Amino acid sequence: MLRAAFRGSAYIGVFARATESCVLVRPDLDDDFVDSIADELGVPAVQTTVGGSSTVGSLAAGNSSGLLVSNRIRERERDRIEAAGVTVGELPGAVNAAGNVVVANDDGAYVHSGLSDDAVAAVEETLDVSATRGQLAGVDTVGTAAVATTDGVLCHPKATDAELERIEETLGVYADVGTVNYGAPLVGSGLVAADDGYLVGDDTTGPEIGRIEDTLGYIE
């Protein structure tokens, strides 16, 4: 576990996205810090923007099969990610901040209820999983409201039992609720997780960390 802030912000999930293949991070972080992030998550780090924006956590989602990004990605950004051996796909349509609207692991993808058929097809093709539309706590931006690994998914504290059951069925893992950064309900904004480790915003409390570790499988 690594408590972190990116340029003074505890909302690290906005600026980083981890899969089991790599972690994207905003490009203006110190090299030693980036090395610490890669070591904690057990995957190589790729420093990049997406569409010229440093909010790469909001604009990318993925799993071991690939990385789905906003269709505003530039060619040189795509080349940088693909150079790390990662397959890149683009999310079509107006709702294209992939990290905000997709939460995925290697068993499934749970996506914004308003995604078009073409967008859902892009999710399924890039990530090689079946996708299910839905909400969490009535929130369509499910990528901000949940964080998943291959062992669990942590969700918005007001997610309903029916929503938790639906995301469990989709991702094939245990789901529970929690918060980050001293009560923030959009857990995706302050948590970056992979199977080997995780980063949390530096305002996250001990009880919040306990729930993260229990839900995402870091405690055996």
Curated annotation (Swiss-Prot):
Keyword Protein biosynthesis assigned: yes
Pfam families on file: eIF-6
Any GO molecular function: ribosome binding
One GO term (biological process): cytosolic ribosome assembly
Top-rank lineage group of the source organism: Archaea
SUPFAM superfamilies on file: Pentein (SSF55909)
Keyword Protein biosynthesis included in the entry's annotation: yes
UniProt function note: Binds to the 50S ribosomal subunit and prevents its association with the 30S ribosomal subunit to form the 70S initiation complex.
Family: Belongs to the eIF-6 family.
NCBIfam families: eIF-6, PRK04046.1-4
Entry protein name: Translation initiation factor 6
Organism: Halobacterium salinarum (strain ATCC 29341 / DSM 671 / R1)
